[in-house]
Amino acid sequence: MNRILILELVTALGFAAVQAAQKPNVLLILVDDLKPAMGCYGDNVAITPNMDALARRGMRFDMAYCNQAVCAPSRFTLMLGAHSTSTGLYGLGSHLRKAWPGAVTMPQHFAKHGYRTESLGKVFHIGHGNQGDPESF
């Protein structure tokens, strides 16, 4: 009986290890006003060896366009998967949880599926009366 239990446990741990190995790492870098001014986008003047190496090893988006003229609503769109016309988040002073209290953001979705999420900088535009979105990280 104990041998069967140990065999089942080892088998289950083996399957868990295989599943964990199949989950890709995700590093999402958001930069305001970057334009394609990096070597990996063909800029001969920009010296961006680290970003170029990340682009070679990972995924580079060639047709990712800003959907709002203001940075905060554009990031809200990316984090929510919904345009400003749907969310009502148009300006720098927009408050995510006031407009969409039950919203599930991209970081929340990743966390729900076993990822560790972190944020550095103004992903949810801290300032202009905003405090970020602690629920997302």
Q: What feature does the model see in each segment?
A:
Residues 4-16:
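Bacterial N-terminal signal peptides
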Residues 2-4, 18-137:
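Formylglycine-dependent sulfatase
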